[in-house]
Amino acid sequence: MPIDRAAIAAITAALAPFRPRVAAALANIGMLASSGISTRQMARALPQIITEAVPIDALGVFWSSAEGMMTDGWSEVPSLLSAATLRSSADYRAVRKYGWPTFGENVLAGPGAGMLPPRQDEAFYASAFYAGSFGAGGMRHILDAVVHDGNRPWGCYLLMRRSEQGPFDAQEIATAAAIGQLSIPAFLQADAPRPATRRFAGGVISTGADGSIVFRNLAAHQSLWMLARDHEQPLSDIGDDSFEDLYGRFCAEGAAKALQTGNHREEHRNRWGNFVINYARSDDAGVIVTIDQMLPFACHLATRIAGLDLSPRRVMVCWLLVLGHSRKDIAHLLEVGVDTVNEHISALYARFGAGTAVDLVRAFSD
């Protein structure tokens, strides 16, 4: 999807206060958010991309109503949005009015970001809610970056890290605010089906001969969690959403078929994206289950660009070139000369052994 001049101008303006490395990461986030896909479809790729701008150990993404109340959420750590945690959060809010702010309260702090740290007092850390949620995952420092378009809140990012990294400093808070602002286009984008061709976040589950779960990784839990949260009221009446329950709902039948036939394959599609589940009978009479989420190419591109140590301008040139913009169009969008664009493109081609934009797409597709 081509990116228009208004989007480029907004991204460029947001980068101005930041040093080059952080600005490059923010440019990558802004270009991804403006590429025509929704926040839900890029949620799995976001932690790797955001940590280039602000070091984090875990990320949560939340969506809100116009009134600022949470309507949906996703977290790298599924237990943070388990039914038990949500009930505990409600109980904690009832006891401590300011213990867990709504989006509305955060927006009062400004359209960019609201901070949880001032409210993370000793009572918060001593609460059953903290012990069963953030504490269970080792998360000590929490930063809430609200996504607000000037008229209403759309959601927020919850940036979390363990005590070893220390609390978020003023520069990181400003960076988180910029991430929220740059993400507005993706929050406004409807969750329409998009071509999804790149495998991401390989989930693995293995069972014993008796059907018991012998091994499972976090990516598998994340994928099953997303398959379960695809109804009209995702944060109400969740019921039992333990890993064992999710496996029983989504994988037990496929595993049984694999035991009979040797292999089985399923595909699922919902607002979070496309999921491919493969089952194979193992040598010890158990089953190996792999779960891949298929993400749009834009997510794959953003994760490839993250960590390449490109300048902010080169990040934007790379995005525009791969998305199909001509050199003249890129120069117009970035308000630079064609010669400048040619220099950036030549450097990209030399780095990736490419001779054309098509070659560059192939290089990023590997």
What is each model feature region?
Residues 313-317:
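The N-cap/first-turn positions of alpha helices
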Residues 200-266:
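PAS-family sensory domains
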Residues 245-296:
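PAS-family sensory/regulatory modules and their coupling/dimerization elements
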Residues 324-359:
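Recognition helix of helix-turn-helix DNA-binding domains
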Residues 60, 202-205, 328:
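Sensory-domain cores of signal-transduction modules, predominantly PAS/LOV
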Residues 302-310:
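Short amphipathic alpha-helical boundary/capping segments
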Residues 171, 187-201:
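Short alpha-helical interdomain "coupling" segment at the junction between an upstream regulatory sensor module
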Residues 2-171, 175, 181, 185, ...:
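Regulatory input/activation interfaces that engage signals or partners
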